[in-house]
């Protein structure tokens, strides 16, 4: 089966999730190519239309798999190849993206959703929508000694390191709240997760005192799953699946949007954080939650095969 993956190409690096999923598909014997979109907003995306048509004429594909609603809308404007769209959350939850995602969801052959709330928001009421949560690579995220991780990163042992869940310029991640909450913590280094390879992120999570998630909206944030795999303490606003992910997990806490609450929790609980503690199970089979990238490939492949029948 030959797949063309359509995704944003505006960042220097391909989205880690898209890249890892593609690599897993290749290991399953599928042929995968990429069409990376240059441009922002509706007209920026649609400006790639003739390049996409040229790509599809140059090489025969069995299926187009688009990530996010705007990519999906572009993909569905050609009628030669079946289209599957994976909706990730911001393409549905953000008002400026919603209408484009809703239109694309009607034009596609079928859809995949990373969270169970998304089909209803798009007013898709099929009896069994395709829900496949984003996963992480368990071969890349695992606990190591905090001291060892800091030594490799050349971080100071006697200072605090708090890692933010994303890049500072992503508005939905709400970095202003995070900065306000930690502003009075002494010797605190605030780490932006931007532009790092996954192996480096594994070191950062193991070396850090805390992962801070202050988002206005999320679905099932991969960074929280990766942090759990690294035994990194977490303070997060109650967004997406975070409450379910960290329930009864030691040194992980939900917070309000009051910066004082986050500060008090960080200072009060900080003395008890130890890098060697066990934080519990990341894969919860009893609830049918799939967190590993490799585990999600079989259902994705089944959806692909059904779409081209």
Regions found by a protein language model. Name each.
Residues 66-71:
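Short His-centered aromatic/hydrophobic patch
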Residues 95, 120, 136-152, 173:
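Acidic anion/phosphate-binding donor-loop and adjacent secondary structure
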Residues 105, 203-208:
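Short alpha-helical donor nucleotide-sugar binding micro-motif in glycosyltransferases
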Residues 108-131, 136-140:
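A short, active-site helix/loop in glycosyltransferases that binds the activated sugar's phosphate group
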Residues 154-173, 179-182:
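Conserved donor-binding/catalytic core segment of Leloir-type glycosyltransferases
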Residues 216:
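Aromatic "clamp/platform" in nucleotide-sugar-dependent glycosyltransferases that forms part
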Residues 233-236:
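Short hydrophobic beta-strand element within catalytic cores of glycosyltransferases
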Residues 248-258:
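Conserved acidic donor-binding segment of nucleotide-sugar-dependent glycosyltransferases
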């Amino acid at each position: 089966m030959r797949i063309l993956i359509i995704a944003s190409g505006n960042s220097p690096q391909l989205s880690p999730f898209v890249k890892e999923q593609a690599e897993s598909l290749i290991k399953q014997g599928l042929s995968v190519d990429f069409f990376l979109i240059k441009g922002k907003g509706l007209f920026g995306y649609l400006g790639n239309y003739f390049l996409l048509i040229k790509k599809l004429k140059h090489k025969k594909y069995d299926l187009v798999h688009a990530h996010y609603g705007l990519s999906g809308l572009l993909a569905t404007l050609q009628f030669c190849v079946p289209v599957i769209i994976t909706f990730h959350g911001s393409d549905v939850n953000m008002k400026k993206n919603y209408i484009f995602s809703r239109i694309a969801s009607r034009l596609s052959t079928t859809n995949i959703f990373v969270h169970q709330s998304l089909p209803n928001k798009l007013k898709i009421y099929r009896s069994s929508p395709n829900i496949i949560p984003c996963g992480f690579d368990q071969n890349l995220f695992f606990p190591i000694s905090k001291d060892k991780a800091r030594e490799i990163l050349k971080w100071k042992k006697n200072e605090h390191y708090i890692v933010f869940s994303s890049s500072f310029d992503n508005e939905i991640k709400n970095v202003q709240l995070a900065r306000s909450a930690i502003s009075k913590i002494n010797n605190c280094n605030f780490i932006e997760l931007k532009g790092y390879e996954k192996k480096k992120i594994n070191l950062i999570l193991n070396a850090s005192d805390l992962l801070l998630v202050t988002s206005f909206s999320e679905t099932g944030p991969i960074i929280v799953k990766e942090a759990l795999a690294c035994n990194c303490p977490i303070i997060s606003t109650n967004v997406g699946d975070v409450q379910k992910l960290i329930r009864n997990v030691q040194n992980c806490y939900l917070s309000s949007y009051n910066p004082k609450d986050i500060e008090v929790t960080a200072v009060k609980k900080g003395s008890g954080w130890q890098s060697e503690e066990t934080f519990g199970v990341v894969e919860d089979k009893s609830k049918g939650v799939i967190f590993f990238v490799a585990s999600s490939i079989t259902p994705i492949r089944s959806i692909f095969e059904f779409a081209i029948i």
